[in-house]
Each structure stands twice: as C-alpha cells, then as structure tokens.
Amino acid sequence: MASVRETGVNVSNDGITVVLGSQWGDEGKGKLVDILCDNVDVCARCQGGNNAGHTIVANGVTYDFHILPSGLVNPKCQNLIGSGVVVYLPAFFSELEKLEQKGLKCRDRIFISDRAHLVFDYHQRADALNEAELGKQSIGTTGKGIGPAYSTKATRSGIRVHHLYHWAEFEARYRKNVADLQKRYGAFEYDVEAELIRYKELAQRLKPFVIDAVAFMYEALQSKKRILVEGANALMLDLDFGTYPFVTSSNTTVGGVCTGLGVPPQRIANSIGVVKAYTTRVGAGPFPTEQLNEIGDHLQSVGREVGVTTGRKRRCGWLDLVVVKYSTMINGYTSLNLTKLDILDALDEIKVAVAYIINGKRIETFPADLDSLEEAEIVYETFPGWKVPTTGITHWDQMPENAKKYIEFIEKFVGVPITFIGVGPGRDEMLVKE
C-alpha cells in the first residue's frame, strides 16, 4: 500500500483531520483511522458512546473498539475521549483490559474529558423499558443507554465525570435520577446503595485518566500536533439531519466535532467521508435501496455484515448516492474513502441509486418527511460487474475497467475525489488512488 503521505490527504499539522461516516454507520471508518494513525500525534472521539463499534486488524491481531479511540493501536499516539462522548465506565475499563491482554500498553495514552457525561445502569434500564413500551414502533437501539444518557444531559440532570470527585453532589444527582426514572416507568428493582459503592471505587480508578480536554486540544493545536478525530455512527444517524426518529442521540456531523471537543470550525483542515460500496443499516428505519432478495443475502453473507456492538445482522442494499450526496452537503468532505469494493466482485451487475421520484417529482436530496419515502420510486443507474477479484490490487492501474467506471461515477455524482479504496479487511488492503 502506498503511504498516507503519498495520498494528497496528509494528516495536517496545521489543523484537524476528521473521519466521518457518510451513511448509516458500519462503513469501515476504523480501518482508515488505524492507517492514518500511523502518522498522527492525537486521536480523539468527539461524540457517541459504546454503542459504536468497529474492528481493526493490525499485525495479525484483531482488536474490537467501542468506546476507546482506535489510535491506541499506535504506541506513539495520545488518545482522547472528548466532552461530547457519553461514557459507561464498566465498559471503558473492560475494553481497556481486553486491549492490554492483547499486548497494547494503553494506560498512559488514553484521557477522558472532565466534562464528558456518564452512562449508568439506570440509563440502560430506561433504554430497555422504553423500547419495550414502544413495541412494534421501537427504533432498535443498541440498548447501551446512550439515548437516556443524552436525555439527562439535555434536561441538565446528567452526571459528568468531574461530579465523581464532588461526592455529595454526585450522590444527590444519582439518587434523584433513579427516583425520577422509577416514577416514569414504575418501580423497578435497582440497588442504589451497591451502585454508589461501585462508583466510589470506579472514581478512584478513573482519576489518572481525567483531564481538561479543552486545554488539551488547544495546546495540541498550538503545538502543531497532527490530530485525527474519528466520528462515531454516521450522518444518517445524526439527531438533526438523520432519519429521525430512527437516529442516535448525538450530532454525528462535522459540527459534532466542534461541539464535542471544544474546537473552532476553522481548525478543521480535512474532512474524509467513508462510503461503503453498497449500503447497510442496523435496526429499524427507512432504507430506500434495501434488497430483501438474493442480492441482499449475498451482500450480507459475503460482506459478513454483522454488527460488532449488537451481533445483529445488518440490512443490506445498493449504494445510495442520494444519501452520500446529502451527507456531503452537510459535512463538506474534502475526500472520500470507498470501502468493501471487493464484496461486489462476483456480481453480474451493480446498481446505484441516483434519485427518488416522490409524488411525481424527481429529487436528488434526502427528504425530512420519512413517510414520503414509503411511496418513493428509486431511480437507479446500472453498471456491469467486473467479475474478477479486486483483493490484492495495490495500484489504480490494476483496477478492472468496470470497477474504475463505477468509482469514477461516484466521484462525479458526489463531486468529491475518492482517495482511498478498500479491497479487503486487512489494513494493507487499502488502495491509494493517486
């Protein structure tokens, strides 16, 4: 694989490089982050929680990441969990220990913002009770308590990391939140006293990791450190711009980077959108190009489309460029990473959605009104397959002609160059398009 510095999208030392999902998540952001982390000083998470999930294969070892930044794979990289992240401490320590068991030395390279909000078991209980209450109208959350944690944040009853070190306030907030949830959902069994004892211990274990993240990021920028931010989830799961209400509870856009880390927008130098060569989605919600047929089955099985966090099979369908173009409008991508191209290798023909026809009108942007999508006619562009393996390709001139046409069409339609092309699961199976 060509080095990152040969791509034209270097990790700048005069600003922040951001990696964002352009679809419904699971695009393969972690692999690109892992590759780029070879040349960065800081890797940060800005939003979400341990509802995110991705797998990295490095030096023959497989690592699963949920709450921790994937820059931990690079022994020289400092890693930050920013103020916009919601943190479930048992999961934080469990994930840290699993990485250490695989040989990574992490403890002096991972930091948590003192302004980050905490996720508790009562949030997870509320998550499950809310989904059960919704029944068939449930949105299919990960059950990690992320939504309820962001809810208490929005109502100003949330508990932040710094509250752990002011115990009287922590305890008062904790007891009130449990009482409020029991009023809302009815009395449920919950051992508050045992949980308070547990969090007194966790507070002491966490203390070495806690920092002022705003000052950390400011100093990193002033020192011209190379900074990479990995977004969790994806644009179509954004609270404001995604397929609401079938979304996550944080801002997954480039704007979420600024609010989640406390950095000004003008310090973002590069925004890389990660695009899977087809489309997948976990859980309920609109999916215009979903294929409930042999094509969908092929993409699911060959692509091994099973969620890292939930273990659920992902719904699969054709690439939807209406979604990717809409995502580009919001995030202003400077380049794209097309992933899992190899999963299309065996197909006779490949379709790409380029527009929707709704109420007789052709549109090329994603509508806010989800009901209108149910009646939408999807306009496809059809391409002949290339029918040869792309795995093992290391240079653009080795790419099959039909695959080149597919890639070039995406670039032209979206208006953004594709710089990286994934042709296999390994970190070395990433073609750099000059």
UniProtKB/Swiss-Prot annotation:
Cytoplasm is among the record's keywords: yes
Protein's job: Plays an important role in the de novo pathway and in the salvage pathway of purine nucleotide biosynthesis. Catalyzes the first committed step in the biosynthesis of AMP from IMP.
Organism listed in the record: Schizosaccharomyces pombe (strain 972 / ATCC 24843)
Gene encoding the protein: ade2
Cofactor binding remark: Binds 1 Mg(2+) ion per subunit.
Protein name in UniProt: Adenylosuccinate synthetase
Binding-site positions, substrate: 308-314
Oligomeric form and interacting partners: Homodimer.
Family label: Belongs to the adenylosuccinate synthetase family.
Matches recorded under HAMAP family: Adenylosucc_synth
Activity-regulation annotation: Competitively Inhibited by GMP. Allosterically inhibited by AMP.
Residues annotated for Mg(2+) binding in this entry: 26, 53
Binding, GTP: 25-31, 53-55, 314, 340-342, 422-424
SMART domains attached to this UniProt entry: Adenylsucc_synt (SM00788)
Record flagged with keyword Secreted: no
Enzyme superclass (EC): ligase
Listed GO MF terms: adenylosuccinate synthase activity; AMP binding; GMP binding; GTP binding; magnesium ion binding
Pathway connected to this protein: Purine metabolism; AMP biosynthesis via de novo pathway; AMP from IMP: step 1/2
InterPro entries documented for this protein: Adenylosuccin_syn_GTP-bd, Adenylosuccin_syn_Lys_AS, Adenylosuccinate_synth_dom1, Adenylosuccinate_synth_dom2, Adenylosuccinate_synth_dom3, Adenylosuccinate_synthetase, P-loop_NTPase
